[in-house]
A protein has these predicted regions:
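Long, charged/polar, surface-exposed segments that mediate recognition or autoinhibition
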Residues: 8-10
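Acidic, low-complexity, intrinsically disordered interaction modules
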Residues: 15-71
Length: 71
């Protein structure tokens, strides 16, 4: 499950691979723009966890992109 895999990423990690997808580091502005562009919450999803703020994109239940927001 994606949530468990995200929680396993160390808070200070700058690299990680989940389900074969490499995590990319993005700015808070980039994250906000991505979320604003997906007004129906169909493509980009956000998880704010104890180890960071993550955005991910999935299609048909398959992870396509993973982002960690740099603070």
């Amino acid at each position: 499950m994606i949530l468990d895999e995200l929680l396993a990423i160390p808070a200070d990690a700058t690299t990680a691979t989940i389900q074969g997808v490499e995590m990319q580091i993005i700015s808070a502005d980039q994250a906000d723009n991505m979320l604003e562009a997906d007004t129906n919450d169909e493509k980009t999803h956000e998880c704010i966890l104890k180890n960071g703020r993550f955005l991910f994109e999935s299609e048909n239940g398959e992870l396509k992109a993973l982002y960690k927001v740099h603070i």
